[in-house]
Amino acid sequence: MCGIVGAVAERNITAILIEGLKRLEYRGYDSAGLAVLTQNGELQRRRRIGKVSELEVAVADDPLAGQLGIAHTRWATHGAPTEGNAHPHFSGNDVAVVHNGIIENHEELREELKGLGYVFTSQTDTEVIVHLIHHTLKSIPDLTDALKAAVKRLHGAYGLALISAKQPDRLVAARSGSPLVIGLGLGENFLASDQLALRQVTDRFMYLEEGDIAEIRRDQVSIWDQQGNKVQRETVQYHEGAEAADKGAYRHFMLKEIHEQPSVVQRTLEGRLGKDNVLVQAFGPQAADLFAKVRNVQIVACGTSYHAGMVARYWLESLAGIPCQVEVASEFRYRKVVVQPDTLFVSISQSGETADTLAALRNAKELGFLGSLAICNVGISSLVRESDLTLLTLAGPEIGVASTKAFTTQLVSLMLLTLALGQVRGTLEAGVEAELVEELRRLPTRLGEALAMDATVEKIAELFADKHHTLFLGRGAQYPVAMEGALKLKEISYIHAEAYPAGELKHGPLALVDNDMPVVTVAPNNELLEKLKSNLQEVRARGGELVVFADEHAGMTNGEGTHVIKVPHIADALAPILYTIPLQLLSYYVAVLKGTDVDQPRNLAKSVTVE
């Protein structure tokens, strides 16, 4: 959600800023802009609505060059997506700022600054920041010190970068609730909201922590913590190749990432399985001691990660015998929570920077939970740093806004957690762990077999091309998978989709079913299959068209208004992981047929770093 890039160097940095913004396009945005301090000491700005490519054209048509600059992609919160609301924002033509987050007291500050003679040209909360700093510079002329003073008056979340024409030797930044990372070079340094933006110029990074303020010069980086103490943050070298930011032979990042799932699941399992058991130490050196005390689990997440948590509830209770609650992070953080004794708090996030999930974790630390575990795809994220234990999903960078490989690796990680807890507590049935460990080893192969259904699913997608509504059904642990399928379809094809437990059809959803509303269901060959078949007959009796992803041994066949796609057999416990694949493919091909922007769907952002 929004992207920041900044640079201070001995060379022209305009192309670096634009390339950085391109690498942040996956986060979702509606406008883009940059500001550069030119050789004649003047701050110049270019802003455009739409894609970064349009900003690039504007810069080519009216070039600007300099060695200090900031750039931004905006996802509208305060103020419509217009060029006037796009960042950077100026004050006095000599101070420029870019900002991610939400300033909650912006109206109060706006009125105060208007009283001081400042004229506002946008509807954004960000413009308040730049005028406030401009005013502060009148009494505190050093840019870094002025920033330190000004942020004390800001309430809310922010990651911001600031430059001044009067102090051309530095870029300054502040972080509170919105991530920022410094990229370290030789005679040049950089800033971004995501290290992926800077991978073309460096592989060494320094992550700002909550409350940090940074002064970034060509040959020096200085950081102060929220108490005002000068601190040194760890330098991390990133070794993964840059091919993650390349679609390769695939038409879209989403399709590429769907097809990467066998390999990333294999990577997530490597080094975490013994001969016939899960290696508990994979969760951290204190995991065994902490897991032995666990009597309950509380899972908190958002979006796709929430669906992964819902699947895990079925596993934890049926396999490990541990009561589990799952809650949306934005709800958990604002309600009065009664914490059961010896409850493990589990947070799930692809980015590790999701604002509501982070806030829920921080709230949980005050509520008396036994300990915290983060299941996350980014090892240097805030969520990981602030949790007691961690299990990384190892999915690699995910560029498509609609999550695919992050979801399946989250599910794999949650199964590892289920088996580890059951192992330590002695609550698994005899032979279950060894059996499921063997099935996990076969899982990458099974996922590859599911991907071989690609052409079949592409053909079925034609049924949805002219539809406006779709119903997804599932039973047991497949209900959250149906929810994930519905989310994917609505995210990228813009078809309204809802998911229900199949047993709830008679309690309302059946009223919606007709020959213009396809019904999608997943049907593994388990004890609920016959119940599910009865539910599907109810759909057919009302003229509903069925698309059924069924186990190859389920005995289901095509018929009038019924399209059965056979799915490779897999152990029932792992079926939620496997059945995710065809639902992802279905959503993808429907979106392609409808001509939507698959990788960057409208109004959505990859990493939601504000409430």
From Swiss-Prot:
It holds the Pfam family SIS. It is found in: Cytoplasm. Keywords: Aminotransferase, Cytoplasm, Glutamine amidotransferase, Repeat, Transferase. It is an enzyme of class 2 (transferase). The keyword Repeat applies. Coiled coil: none annotated. One of its GO terms (cellular component) is cytosol. Its EC number is 2.6.1.16. SUPFAM superfamilies: N-terminal nucleophile aminohydrolases (Ntn hydrolases), SIS domain. Residues 287-427, 460-601 form the SIS domain. Residues 2-219 form the Glutamine amidotransferase type-2 domain. It catalyses: D-fructose 6-phosphate + L-glutamine = D-glucosamine 6-phosphate + L-glutamate. GO terms for molecular function: carbohydrate derivative binding; glutamine-fructose-6-phosphate transaminase (isomerizing) activity. The active site is at C2 (nucleophile), K606 (for fru-6p isomerization activity). One of its GO terms (biological process) is protein N-linked glycosylation. Homodimer. PANTHER family: GLUCOSAMINE--FRUCTOSE-6-PHOSPHATE AMINOTRANSFERASE, ISOMERIZING (PTHR10937), GLUTAMINE--FRUCTOSE-6-PHOSPHATE TRANSAMINASE (ISOMERIZING) (PTHR10937:SF0). Catalyzes the first step in hexosamine metabolism, converting fructose-6P into glucosamine-6P using glutamine as a nitrogen source. HAMAP family: GlmS. This is Glutamine--fructose-6-phosphate aminotransferase [isomerizing]. It comes from Pseudomonas putida (strain ATCC 47054 / DSM 6125 / CFBP 8728 / NCIMB 11950 / KT2440). The gene is glmS.
